[in-house]
From Swiss-Prot:
CC terms in the record's Gene Ontology section: Noc4p-Nop14p complex; nuclear membrane; nucleolus; nucleoplasm; small-subunit processome
PANTHER family xref list: NUCLEOLAR COMPLEX PROTEIN 4, NUCLEOLAR COMPLEX PROTEIN 4 HOMOLOG
Membrane topology of this protein: Multi-pass membrane protein
Keywords: Membrane, Nucleus, Transmembrane, Transmembrane helix
GO molecular function, one term: RNA binding
Transmembrane regions: 297-317, 347-367, 375-395
Domain of life per record: Eukaryota
A Pfam short name: CBF
Origin species: Homo sapiens
Entry keyword Ubl conjugation: no
Descriptive protein name: Nucleolar complex protein 4 homolog
Family: Belongs to the CBF/MAK21 family.
SUPFAM superfamilies per the UniProt record, alphabetical: ARM repeat
Gene Ontology annotations of biological process type: rRNA processing
Length: 516
């Protein structure tokens, strides 16, 4: 294609080719010149070619000049005896197919401007293909959507090679439409299956792209809201699955389960677990199917175990899931490091939630109170100011455990029946012991810790103490608070005012020293 140098020259040359193709079928071969520019290495030329292709094939779709139905082989049609119009439409449909494939490749272009334009053009074709289907309707009211083209789009977004988070942020706005969201979920299932099947070791970039897309999907809360379609429809048929929230939830579930059944990077486990309780579980058709993922995450230890327990707790209390090892897992997370990790506040917030039921057996609550009290002996002051009210709250909720602080004839310290090495709280014999650790902490060097530990010396008040303000307390905050404390009035040390540097005449100091 002859063209003037520079982007402006390319624009004018492409414009002439576009006008020629749209004006006369005899100029159809000019499409090759337009498609050739899509292969250019110049970023600005590619952008002009994408815009031209968008206008060209958008117009052809609207005018019905592309073949409709199962696309036959180009060679077979061109050498056959079909009419010129049919040959033209089949030939142009093949060119349209080549254009879409190239636009799909451009979703991985180094330039974000090129990727953004390619995405915009492909989604325009999706909308136009939906309005002017390239497949024949099998019956009246048959729901048609350009699924293969849309799979191409989603496949480009879920690239195994590069981070597509910026492009995915542009795509998020299309997830507000019910039909594109529904087909995005279906296409994501296919993309995960394809990539995991092709790569023995799936690149981290793919997992990150997939999570970015999946976490952006949010379902409507009520059935009547499923009516906003990207591909405009004259009417909605009740037989369409895409029009029912129940089907959306089923596909949403399939999408997440297909993703979570694979071994993910640890960083992704944490990201998923942070949103599982409010963004995933409430929207699943069968939330209990998440049990495999949550138990697998629970075995990873540390913060991941804690976050997984949060999801399991929801399944137990809201969906009647039976998980006998729940409190045993939580008990196993209590070790000296729990006071020093960055997720300490979240841990104790969730632990307080898990132990909030007054129907828990006394032996179980006693085991947690005793384990925390034992760990408190080596905990820093900022942690003690939170964990001591935590223990007292457990005693308030469960009066049967108050025997731990009222056992006057209990065993000596060297005969404490509590077994700190026992992993099962039911076998720890905590209820036979006492919280002597709290009495020991009454002699702590920090006065606020000593005061907090002394609460057990009186009858515990029934209203619980809120630990929320204490969860994120730091040593720096305690230090600053101590510095700002106002001390008592100055203590008088001598009732007779001093006179002079050596005191009053006649005093011992004045008798033996002189200032002369």
């Amino acid at each position: 294609m002859e063209r003037e140098p520079g982007a402006a020259g390319v624009r004018r040359a492409l414009g002439r080719r576009l006008e020629a193709v749209l004006a006369s079928r005899s100029e159809a071969n000019a499409v090759f010149d337009i498609l050739a520019v899509l292969q250019s290495e110049d970023q600005e030329e590619i952008q002009e070619a994408v815009r031209t292709c968008s206008r060209l094939f958008g117009a052809l779709l609207e005018r019905g000049e592309l073949f409709v139905g199962q696309l036959p082989s180009e060679e077979m049609v061109m050498t056959g005896s079909q009419g010129a119009t049919r040959k033209y439409k089949v030939w142009m449909r093949h060119r349209y197919h080549s254009c879409c494939n190239r636009l799909g490749e451009l979703l991985g272009h180094p330039s974000f401007q090129v990727k953004e334009l390619a995405l915009s053009a492909l989604l325009k074709f999706v909308q136009l293909e939906g309005a002017h289907p390239l497949e024949k309707s099998k019956w009246e009211g048959n729901y048609l959507f350009p699924r293969e083209l849309f799979k191409l789009v989603v496949g480009g977004l879920l690239s195994p090679e590069e981070d597509q988070s910026l492009l995915l942020s542009q795509f998020r706005e299309y997830l507000d439409y019910d039909d594109t969201r529904y087909h995005t979920m279906q296409a994501a299932v296919d993309a995960v299956a394809r990539v995991t099947g092709q790569h023995p070791e799936v690149p981290p970039a793919f997992w990150n792209n997939a999570f970015t897309l999946l976490s952006a999907v949010s379902l409507p809360r009520r059935e009547p809201t499923v009516s906003s379609f990207y591909v405009k429809r004259a009417e909605l048929w009740d037989t369409w699955k895409v029009a029912h929230l129940k089907e959306h939830r089923r596909v949403f579930q399939a999408m997440w389960l297909s993703f979570l059944k694979h071994k993910l990077p640890l960083s992704l486990y944490k990201k998923v677990l942070l949103i599982v309780h409010d963004a995933i579980l409430p929207q699943l058709a069968q939330p209990t199917l998440m049990i495999d993922f949550l138990t697998r995450a629970c075995d990873l230890g540390g913060a991941l175990s804690l976050l997984a327990l949060n999801g399991l707790f929801i399944l137990i209390h809201k969906h009647n899931l039976e998980y006998p090892d729940f409190y045993r897992k939580l008990y196993g997370l209590l070790d000296p490091s729990v006071f020093h990790v960055k997720y300490r506040a979240r841990f104790f917030h969730l632990a307080d939630l898990f132990l909030s039921s007054s129907h828990l057996p006394a032996y179980l609550v006693a085991a947690f109170a005793k384990r925390l009290a034992r760990l408190a002996l080596t905990a820093p002051p900022e942690a003690l100011l939170m964990v001591l009210p935590f223990i007292c709250n457990l005693l308030r909720r469960h009066p049967a455990c108050r025997v731990l602080v009222h056992r006057p004839h209990g065993p000596e310290l060297d005969a404490d029946p509590y077994d700190p090495g026992e992993e099962d709280p039911a076998q720890s014999r905590a209820l036979e012991s006492s919280l002597w650790e709290l009495q020991a902490l009454q002699r702590h060097y920090h006065p606020e810790v000593s005061k907090a530990a002394s609460v057990i010396n009186q009858a515990l008040s029934m209203p619980e103490v809120s630990i929320a303000p204490l969860l994120e307390l730091t040593a720096y905050e305690i230090f600053e608070r101590d510095l700002k404390k106002k001390g008592p009035e100055p203590v008088p040390l001598e009732f007779i005012p001093a006179q002079g540097l050596l005191g009053r005449p006649g005093e011992l100091c004045a008798q033996h020293f002189t200032l002369s």
